[in-house]
Amino acid sequence: MVSTPARMPGFVILTTLISTGLFHSIPVSFRPMSFIKPPKTLLRQVGRAIIDFNMIREGDRVLLGLSGGKDSLSLLHILHHFQRHAPIHFELAAMTVDPMAGDFDPSPMIPYLKSLGVEYHYRKEPIMDMAKKHMGKPSYCSFCSRIKRGIMYSTAREHKFNVIALAQHLDDLAESFLMSAFHGGKLKTMKAHYINDDGDLRIIRPLVYARERQTRAFSEASELPVIPDSCPACFSMPTQRQHMKELLADEEQLNKTLFKSLLTTLKPLMSEGKPE
């Protein structure tokens, strides 16, 4: 095993994966190079979601799933901002699972998280090779998602995190709702806050009131180091989700209050199973 230095006051541990597959840790200064303040509207929406669904509590240790995309990077900065200004204390770390697919390269996240003073865990797994052996092509994305989630759960347990934060937004929930209704015959969507099956981790989605166009605008205006999605499975075929995205975009052209109405529709569904 690789020994890790003890935590020191004013320091956090940046965890990265080396070629042997073992972790090593580097103490880095907790003081970030600079703070990026997210837009007030995003802060207000996320703050409201956190309150409405009781997502983050005093003393929580939160592990953020960081893909390097615009949504997870936006949520990183929002939670980072709340760490400094919220009336409660919570700890924040981030994790990237590299599925070893296409040209995906999360290495820019390492110095970036270091500059923010955020503890970072990076793990590399041949998920695409596993999917090719065990799944049909249309199932790659769901298989990858399940494996990544399992890796995040095990990492959270190992490092004593009790909350996992995911970056799905209102557009994602609306698309999931239509997919479930059209293809599954059920009225359901992603939950805003729930407990995993083992009962030891809470999973939260603080962006459930926010739109995708907001995270895109924030990431572009702030020049966040977005890593393009380069998974070949995601681009080799049209997906049900992409079809729903296009359907919603067409409908929103005709109905500008579409997502306001959808949020009213979805709120009881996303509230199911909310922990007290």
Task: Please state what every model-predicted region is.
Residues 2-12, 17, 28:
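Short amphipathic, helix-prone segments within low-complexity/disordered or flexible regions
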Residues 31-179, 183, 213-221, 273:
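ATP-dependent adenylation/nucleotidyltransferase module used to activate substrates
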Residues 92, 172-250:
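Catalytic subdomain that performs nucleotidyl-dependent activation
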Residues 99-101, 127-129, 194-197, 210, ...:
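Residue-level detector of flexible, active-site-proximal loop/helix-junction positions
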Residues 243, 247-269:
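An accessory alpha-helical subdomain
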